[in-house]
Amino acid sequence: AKSHGLYDLIIDPGYGFAKTTEQNFKLLKESSLLQSLDLPVLTGLSRKSMIYKTLDSTADKALNGTTALHMQALLSGSHILRVHDVAPAQECVSLFEALRNS
């Protein structure tokens, strides 16, 4: 990509796009493997059906599930979280950083 003038790249595994719930969870479970690409990884799990369907809820009521999976993504090496609910995501990142730096 760099040989074609593309320098600002990130990996977005595309949670929710053309995948079953099971495939999305497997992708998240194995997402640490994306670190081998040596590029920042963006995780977009906010309000995804894999969360609210698993919890038998609705997108707007599944914030705790989103936060739990955000923590998993961070622990697996994600660099960027794409979110709808900024304050709870920032709390998650702050707790992750405290854990990582302890």
Where are these regions (language model features)?
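Active-site-adjacent loop and "lid" segments of alpha/beta metabolic enzymes
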Residues: 3-7, 18-102
